[in-house]
């Protein structure tokens, strides 16, 4: 279904010496197969997806060698209008693929472009919303959805169009555990229906029992291929060396929290009567909350619970009621941006400079070029000083925003999904950066669904549910148990053993042409088997007609 033959590609960015992103890559994926592209940030995973969905070379220009075939069609020669009927795409940032203001319109957009009749379109949307459990998200304003809810709508929109191939770029990056379970169900469903699924991903554990192969890229080349069994057997040290994160669910909890981080017992952040409403509806209510000085608090909860809204209120970006005290001093709402720094979920929204180095010095004119390069080395961005921030991968942009936060030295540090798009190596680097920045701050809050990050740097858990604080506890042994409960650790996520009709559906999805031929042969065989009975029937009819003189 997908075939890349000796493909090399470099983006056209106006520089004399363009960096080769992919070098002599050969790859193929069959019908009904789920293949996972993994590797460090910037290794070429997203570029491979762009080759498959036709965005390269029709949208992203550059030097392309080799050929890319999808469903027997050469992508270089196939217009995007035709490619979109074959390949569906879920991008790393779902906002970049939205064209409507409401969720129902967005779900129907692909079907409208394919001229699907309205009655059939309505029936298809009802079916998709039911199968993917999206009923509560229909007829909603897209701008009021959380990042995870937007990702669910993007997945539903693609699935509704029934493409033969689906490419997904970090589909789990902003999802809570319940939404990840829905994503697992969706991927299994697409496999069972015979669709080819190609996923670029750092969070690998949820694909256990789903992925058929893991392809590891390094510096634009395919370094290694793993079977599911071989990937699951990789040790922690080997995964670190390859830049991979947990491959199995139980590997998420290999580490234990470090309770030696807090040196003080004074209050770093105090909140009283914080409330926020949207369209006459209260979405956040925090009557009272005290966070110790030096604490690194993991803010957890389901998508849409109010976690990001909470961080935006503390950063002074949303007008709210109530008081906020940092180190015992009451901070007026308009003064919050001077005391608080927020690394947003979509890092590209905070990058304004023409160069990577310029991004660090934009709000820090006193920062020397030498010091700025040292920070970039700490971020793993050395050698990229003069690149445009927009040319970085999603994970690299995230780390650049973290570096900017480190240079700002604010009293309260807020991070919204800081490990979105981060590989195993940079997950560790992110945890170290957060701990380093926390040494200069009163407190730190991290909005995250990532237990790997939490166990590497957090000291407390703050559980927000339906806009209210449900629990605030230290991340000790009891805290880990509570976190696992919130994350639905007891829920069944492994692939169930298929029997009966589901097993038959999976087989028919993968071997549809073979079964079609078998059906044809069965039909012909049935005709031959019926032949003698037909002859007996007509002979008996003739005999009876003769005996009755033609009256039968």
Region annotations inferred by a language model:
Residues 221-244, 468-494:
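Conserved beta-strand-loop-alpha-helix hinge in the C-terminal portion
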């Amino acid at each position: 279904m997908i075939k890349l033959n000796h493909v090399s590609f470099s983006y056209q960015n106006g520089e004399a010496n363009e960096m080769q992103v992919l070098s002599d890559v050969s790859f193929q994926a069959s019908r009904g197969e789920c293949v996972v592209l993994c590797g460090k940030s910037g290794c070429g995973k997203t570029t491979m997806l762009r080759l498959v969905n036709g965005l390269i070379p029709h949208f992203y220009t550059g030097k392309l060698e080799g050929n890319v075939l999808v469903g027997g069609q050469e992508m270089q020669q196939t217009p995007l209008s035709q490619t979109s009927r074959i390949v569906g795409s879920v991008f790393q940032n779902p906002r970049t693929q939205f064209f409507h203001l409401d969720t129902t319109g967005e779900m129907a957009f692909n079907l409208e472009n394919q001229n699907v009749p309205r009655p059939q379109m309505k029936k298809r949307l009802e079916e998709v919303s039911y199968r993917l459990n999206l009923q509560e998200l229909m007829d909603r304003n897209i701008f009021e959805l959380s990042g995870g809810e937007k990702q669910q709508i993007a997945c539903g929109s693609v699935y509704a169009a029934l493409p033969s191939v689906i490419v997904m770029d970090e589909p789990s990056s902003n999802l809570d555990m319940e939404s990840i379970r829905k994503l697992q169900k969706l991927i299994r469903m697409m496999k069972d229906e015979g669709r080819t699924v190609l996923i670029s991903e750092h969070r690998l554990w949820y694909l256990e029992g789903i992925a058929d192969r893991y392809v590891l890229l390094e510096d634009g080349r395919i370094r290694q291929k793993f079977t599911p069994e071989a990937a699951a057997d990789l040790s922690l040290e080997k995964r670190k060396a390859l830049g991979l994160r947990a491959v199995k669910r139980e590997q998420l909890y290999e580490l234990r929290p470090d309770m030696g981080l807090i040196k003080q017992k004074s209050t770093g952040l105090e909140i009283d009567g914080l409330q926020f409403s949207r369209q006459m509806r209260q979405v956040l209510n925090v009557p009272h909350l005290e966070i110790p000085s030096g604490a690194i608090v993991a803010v957890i909860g389901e998508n849409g619970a109010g976690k990001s809204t909470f961080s935006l209120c503390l950063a002074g970006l949303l007008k709210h009621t109530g008081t906020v005290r940092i180190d015992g001093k009451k901070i007026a709402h308009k003064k919050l941006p001077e005391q608080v720094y927020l690394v947003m979920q979509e890092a590209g929204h905070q990058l304004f400079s023409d160069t990577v180095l310029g991004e660090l010095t934009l709000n820090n004119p006193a920062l020397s070029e030498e010091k700025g390069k040292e920070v970039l080395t700490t971020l793993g961005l050395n050698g990229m000083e003069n690149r445009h921030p927009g040319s970085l991968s999603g994970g690299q942009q995230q780390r650049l925003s973290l570096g900017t936060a480190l240079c700002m030295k604010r009293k309260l540090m807020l991070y919204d999904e800081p490990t979105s798009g981060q590989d195993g190596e940079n997950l560790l680097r992110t945890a170290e950066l957060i701990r380093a920045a926390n040494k200069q701050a009163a407190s730190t809050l991290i909005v995250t669904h990532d237990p790997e990050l939490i166990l590497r740097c957090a000291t407390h858990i703050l559980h927000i549910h339906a806009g209210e604080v449900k629990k605030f506890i230290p991340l000790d042994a009891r805290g880990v148990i509570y976190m696992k409960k919130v994350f639905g650790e007891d829920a069944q996520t492994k692939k169930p053993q298929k029997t009966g009709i589901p097993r038959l559906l999976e087989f028919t999805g993968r071997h549809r042409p073979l079964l079609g031929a078998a059906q044809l042969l069965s039909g012909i065989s049935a005709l031959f088997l019926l032949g003698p009975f037909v002859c007996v029937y007509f002979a008996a009819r003739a005999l009876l007609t003769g005996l009755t003189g033609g009256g039968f």
